[in-house]
Amino acid sequence: MAYAAVLLDIEGTVCPISFVKESLFPFFLKQVDTLCSSQDLQVQRLLTQFQVDDVAGHIRSLVARDVKDPILKQLQGLVWENGYKDGQIKAPVYDDAIKFIKNSDVPVYIYSSGSVKAQKLLFQYVESRSNTLDLRPFIKGYFDINTSGVKTQSESYARIANNVGIKPNGVLFISDNPFELDAAKITGMQTMLAVRPGNSEVRDALKYNPVTNFDDL
């Protein structure tokens, strides 16, 4: 399989699918009331965009339903930044993914529903035996739903390919979500299904070119 760039999903692909829902979401939810009473201008600007009376309740509802809301994603990034910086959060990136990102012969890009800010934080504070590891120097660029669109729409992948200056058929996209892979494939991108512990079983997984370890790439 020849490709000129790799586009990676995060949750369920380079780190356990449980990390977001069992670590990041609970950390954020504990800060919702404090967030809603914040006098920070950036936070206030984001909160007013919800245009609802019960902002805290609305935020909790979005998180509970795992809605990919762009305003929510930005707020989460702001809250998680504090958690990463004070050592409460470390990202459990798979060892084989760390090795692949550090040693890839082609540019590595990230595409996640989480904000670009949250993505950079995750890769800046990767859990390692020596406290934390910063993978940002090895990642060429980041894309999210604000910059590129929803991950289940083919137009999003066309935008990314255009942005990186590589034809879609020269990009390999790896994700645990078959709907995302279907969307990417429409543009001509090469695709692989990430099969990791805890991921949902995918029907007809073989047709999605499954990979269980990035050492096999």
Swiss-Prot record:
Pathway per its UniProt entry is:
Amino-acid biosynthesis; L-methionine biosynthesis via salvage pathway; L-methionine from S-methyl-5-thio-alpha-D-ribose 1-phosphate: step 3/6; Amino-acid biosynthesis; L-methionine biosynthesis via salvage pathway; L-methionine from S-methyl-5-thio-alpha-D-ribose 1-phosphate: step 4/6
Q: How is the cofactor bound?
A: Binds 1 Mg(2+) ion per subunit.
The record's EC number reads 3.1.3.77
Query: What cofactor does this one take?
Result: Mg(2+)
**What is catalysed by this protein?**
5-methylsulfanyl-2,3-dioxopentyl phosphate + H2O = 1,2-dihydroxy-5-(methylsulfanyl)pent-1-en-3-one + phosphate
List where in the cell it is found: Cytoplasm; Nucleus
Residues recorded as binding Mg(2+), renumbered to this chain, are: 9, 11, 176
- Residues of the signal peptide: none
Where does the source fall among the domains of life?
Answer: Eukaryota
Q: Which residues bind substrate?
A: 112-113, 151
* Main location group: cytoplasm
Recite the UniProt keywords alphabetically. Answer: Amino-acid biosynthesis, Cytoplasm, Hydrolase, Magnesium, Metal-binding, Methionine biosynthesis, Nucleus
What terms describe the molecular function in GO for this protein?
Answer: acireductone synthase activity; magnesium ion binding
- State a GO cellular component annotated for this protein: nucleus
List the InterPro entries.
Enolase-ppase_E1, ENOPH1_eukaryotes, HAD-like_sf, HAD_sf
Q: Which biological process annotations from GO are given for this protein?
A: L-methionine salvage from methylthioadenosine
Q: Does the keyword Repressor apply?
A: no
Keyword field contains DNA-binding:
no
What EC class does the entry list?
A: hydrolase
Show the HAMAP family listed in the entry.
Salvage_MtnC_euk (MF_03117)
Q: How does it assemble?
A: Monomer.
NCBIfam families named in the record: enolase-ppase
Function summary: Bifunctional enzyme that catalyzes the enolization of 2,3-diketo-5-methylthiopentyl-1-phosphate (DK-MTP-1-P) into the intermediate 2-hydroxy-3-keto-5-methylthiopentenyl-1-phosphate (HK-MTPenyl-1-P), which is then dephosphorylated to form the acireductone 1,2-dihydroxy-3-keto-5-methylthiopentene (DHK-MTPene).
Q: What family is reported? A: Belongs to the HAD-like hydrolase superfamily. MasA/MtnC family.
Q: What is this protein called?
A: Enolase-phosphatase E1
Species this chain originates from: Lachancea thermotolerans (strain ATCC 56472 / CBS 6340 / NRRL Y-8284)
Please name the gene that encodes this protein: UTR4
